[in-house]
């Protein structure tokens, strides 16, 4: 058993122990609404808490059939955060979030964030999931994860939940314990594993193409916005330079006018002084006679 399988087994044992401990000490809490009634609306804080808890357990969800136990663990963690939600409510809310996220895949990131406020949180979970698969592919076998399990990792989460629950029911059916049927299923599983590997590779390639396309569109949008911003900034700078030139011209004109006015006043003052001096000289001559 390698380190990855050991970690996964340890995590399942912890979750099972936590589930049994909770059942032994905590009485069954009824759903906040009766069957058939509408679930109470989820708040933004409550939804973010659910996404965070579900993201922490995402790898375990992808590698185990006992999702019912995991949803009960999520429900208990939500109650610990003062959000009394039943496992079924958490599961339904997660399916709705996945559906909305998949509906935003063809949009630009900025538009998706405006229409779906939890886009970044969901994107982080799915990107991390794909990175794990890429790492498993590069290791040449997925660390003990079967081809069918890897294929389910990239199917929709709605299908994943139903498939895992059906697998649990089938494994408990006595009719399936027929050895001949088990041998036939194993032979069929070999071909399914090969097909699953091809399917996983196609999904990975499509995902990478989608990522490259999204990054290219984002880069083009960013460059267009940057170009528009630079053009507006250049236009604003040009207008400011024109206004500065106009201000300097007006100031120069005002100074010229002010100098002309002072020159005229000085000339008038000189003429006035000359006239007064001439008049005084005349009066002096007349008085002496």
Swiss-Prot record:
Residue span, Myb-like domain: 42-98
Motif (Bipartite nuclear localization signal): 65-81
GO CC terms of this entry: mediator complex; nucleolus; nucleus
Swiss-Prot/TrEMBL keywords: Coiled coil, DNA-binding, Nucleus, Transcription, Transcription regulation
Swiss-Prot/TrEMBL GO biological process terms: regulation of DNA-templated transcription
InterPro entries linked: Myb_DNA-bind_4 (IPR044822), SANT/Myb (IPR001005)
Function: Probable transcription factor that may play a role in the induction of CAM4 in response to pathogen and salt.
Protein's recorded name: Trihelix transcription factor GT-3b
Taxonomic source organism: Arabidopsis thaliana
């Amino acid at each position: 058993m390698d380190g990855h399988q050991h970690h996964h087994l340890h995590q399942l044992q912890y979750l099972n122990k936590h589930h049994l401990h909770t059942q032994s000490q905590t009485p069954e809490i009824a759903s906040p609404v009766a069957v058939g009634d509408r679930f109470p609306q989820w708040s933004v804080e409550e939804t973010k808490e659910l996404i965070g808890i579900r993201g922490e357990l995402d790898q375990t969800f992808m590698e185990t059939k006992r999702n019912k136990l995991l949803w009960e663990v999520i429900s208990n963690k939500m109650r610990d955060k003062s959000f009394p939600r039943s496992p079924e409510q958490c599961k339904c809310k997660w399916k709705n979030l996945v559906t909305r996220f998949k509906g935003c895949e063809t949009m630009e990131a900025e538009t998706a964030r405006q229409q779906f406020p939890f886009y970044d949180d969901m994107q982080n979970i799915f990107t991390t999931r794909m990175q794990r698969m890429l790492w498993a592919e590069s290791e040449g076998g997925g660390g003990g994860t079967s081809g069918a399990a890897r294929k389910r990792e990239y199917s929709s989460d709605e299908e994943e939940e139903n498939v895992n629950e059906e697998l649990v029911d089938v494994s408990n059916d006595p009719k399936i314990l027929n050895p001949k049927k088990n041998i036939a299923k194993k032979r069929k599983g070999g071909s399914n594993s090969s097909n699953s590997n091809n399917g996983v590779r196609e999904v990975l390639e499509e995902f990478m193409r989608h990522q490259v396309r999204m990054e290219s569109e984002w880069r083009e949008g960013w460059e267009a916005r940057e170009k528009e911003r630079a053009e507006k900034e250049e236009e604003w700078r040009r207008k400011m330079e024109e206004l500065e030139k106009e201000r300097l011209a007006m100031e120069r004109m005002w100074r010229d006018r002010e100098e002309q006015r002072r020159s005229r006043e000085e000339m008038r003052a000189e003429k006035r002084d000359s006239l007064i001096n001439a008049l005084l000289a005349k009066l002096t001559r007349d008085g002496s006679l």
